[in-house]
């Protein structure tokens, strides 16, 4: 059976792995998931990631990051979902925790943070909030 929301599955796997203090988590790979992982790495929420072929099916291996024994990601939640897409113009993209967190947005220029989307004047679909 196919997954109805693969991005929510990825975020849930990250959240669950951090609750049990795993070093890495494996997620089925896709271009959007790799782009989300790149944004998380650029913002310092994860240590790194790599795509590995596992029996012909690519797997995204995400190295989780901890500080003083606590997960760096305190909150990660899906915003736009298959049943209710959330699109925002560049002026309406929300700030997460007054700028302490990030909203990950997919735009015509690719997947980026809310700050970069506002700076480039581009709106798009708000995928998730990370803090």
Swiss-Prot record:
Alphabetically ordered keywords of this record: Ribonucleoprotein, Ribosomal protein, RNA-binding, rRNA-binding
PROSITE patterns, A to Z: RIBOSOMAL_S8 (PS00053)
One GO process term, biological-process aspect: translation
Stored Pfam families: Ribosomal_S8
Domain of life (superkingdom): Bacteria
Cited InterPro entries: Ribosomal_uS8, Ribosomal_uS8_CS, Ribosomal_uS8_sf
Gene3D superfamilies: 3.30.1370.30, 3.30.1490.10
SUPFAM superfamilies in the cross-refs: Ribosomal protein S8
One cellular component term from this protein's GO annotations in UniProt: ribonucleoprotein complex
Molecular function terms from GO: rRNA binding; structural constituent of ribosome
Main function: One of the primary rRNA binding proteins, it binds directly to 16S rRNA central domain where it helps coordinate assembly of the platform of the 30S subunit.
Subunit details: Part of the 30S ribosomal subunit. Contacts proteins S5 and S12.
PANTHER family: 40S RIBOSOMAL PROTEIN S15A
Family recorded in the similarity comment: Belongs to the universal ribosomal protein uS8 family.
Name under which the protein is recorded: Small ribosomal subunit protein uS8
Species of provenance: Polaromonas naphthalenivorans (strain CJ2)
